[in-house]
């Protein structure tokens, strides 16, 4: 069986795509024309180069790999086009370099004759559905068999712990994927948590032999039970073997999570209170969270009350602080979702259940290949490039935080099979444009439009009134986390801290002050094409009278006329001055009125100019 392109490790594909992306447009089109014969499809992929953060070569290879293209076909094509640097990236992944001709011999191998004929007929062979013959510089049989064997070695099982947390790893793999400074052998009981050891009998007694009435939740890798010991409530995480997992995977998973929990001490990360490594089962012990998970409270499951906006903002701020702390230790949680944000009796958030992926120490460990079907429950919180490519970086956690923030802001579940689209991320990403120009003003205006769209269409209404400024800042934090490029966790954290502070301050302000600070947009003057000239000719006396009515009414005289007192006149004068504002100088009276261009019209004019400069297509100008 041939080794297919989609079986290549992510680090190989990434290096290959970056190399081919740097080719000239002519060379790239020549390469792509051998892969895709349909010009319409080719132009569609080529147009994606305008989208920020998208590699058109990766999209091209993804399209080709879905049609069962092999690594042999890819190498043959690269050598036929004399793209030897790109071919070397693929060939360097092969386990048997002696079965390959040296790279310096490529120019001598590619001569007129069978090799050139094979390259010229590559396009015709693809049309006929025939496999492409290997070039003369590759040995038949051993090359693809070796590639297949290496592919199986380089695809780590999803249950395996990262290199820095593994216990029994072969020296060859350890030297290839891990830094030499990381210990290769580590005993489980050498951890600093020896004193936290629980016996099987203690856990069985606390959970009443894992009675079903004590079960809190059921997961892919573990079940959570509630137990009690010495009058204190605990949560017991009982690990279980997954079908098809490698031997000892549960031990490695236990050790990985223990090391992570013992290493991370933060008020917003769930602490580890104990562990058990018995013959019957393995278990981790955590404090019991009285208010369940954020997911339960968002949709008021059970008898729980609806979370208020200050509580929601505080929970989101705590979540961002927890993830930021993990990233400062070069640890990727990779399992951030509302179900894993637990709430204690004071509604303080505790991030739990990490998959325990430390950041890599070298380039090749930047990528972790995982099977998608094991992450179906978490797919709603994962970016598309991680699901497709398996590239695990800190951006995965930032994207997941954005989805959780959006859940709290909108009250919409991350996944709903009865909704179209099913995933909340697809609903939000349709609002966030993927194409951004280098013009700063256009990026700023586009971001404001996206924020307003999210607030107007999807804001949660059941949790009460959220000030407009807070809602827009919150939506900005969501947009920052979901950006394809330059997603910033720190920027989102600062935004949510501002929202939390503003909501706390409003609890102590009178309603009049709140209305001034969060003022509705109805009091903000807007420019329109239809100008009522009568509004410009209102006498100043009418304005003074209307403002004076705000003050307390004067006492009535016997003849029915109102005779204001001295204090009343002073109040009226001060009231009129406050309404009228500072009087402009005489010479500046005529220039106090000016015409301002409508923001939407100005943005449209800018987009039209960008369209004329071919920096913007018609779909982005007028919408799909």
UniProtKB/Swiss-Prot annotation:
It comes from the Eukaryota. Keywords: ATP-binding, Nucleotide-binding. InterPro entries: DEATH-like_dom_sf (IPR011029), Death_dom (IPR000488), Death_IRAK2 (IPR042151), Kinase-like_dom_sf (IPR011009), Prot_kinase_dom (IPR000719). Transmembrane segments: none annotated. Residues 13-94 form the Death domain. GO terms for biological process: canonical NF-kappaB signal transduction; interleukin-1-mediated signaling pathway; intracellular signal transduction; lipopolysaccharide-mediated signaling pathway; negative regulation of canonical NF-kappaB signal transduction; positive regulation of canonical NF-kappaB signal transduction; regulation of cytokine-mediated signaling pathway; response to interleukin-1. ATP binds at residues 216-224, 237, 337-340. Coiled coil: none annotated. The keyword Protein biosynthesis does not apply. Residues 508-536, 549-593 are annotated as: Disordered. Residues 210-475 form the Protein kinase domain. Residues 558-577 have a biased composition (Polar residues). One of its GO terms (cellular component) is nucleus. GO terms for molecular function: ATP binding; molecular adaptor activity; protein heterodimerization activity; protein homodimerization activity; protein kinase activity; signaling adaptor activity. The protein kinase domain is predicted to be catalytically inactive. PANTHER family: INTERLEUKIN-1 RECEPTOR-ASSOCIATED KINASE (PTHR24419), INTERLEUKIN-1 RECEPTOR-ASSOCIATED KINASE-LIKE 2 (PTHR24419:SF2). Interacts with MYD88. IL-1 stimulation leads to the formation of a signaling complex which dissociates from the IL-1 receptor following the binding of PELI1. Binds to the IL-1 type I receptor following IL-1 engagement, triggering intracellular signaling cascades leading to transcriptional up-regulation and mRNA stabilization. Belongs to the protein kinase superfamily. TKL Ser/Thr protein kinase family. Pelle subfamily. This is Interleukin-1 receptor-associated kinase-like 2. It comes from Rattus norvegicus (Rat). The lineage of its organism: Eukaryota, Metazoa, Chordata, Craniata, Vertebrata.
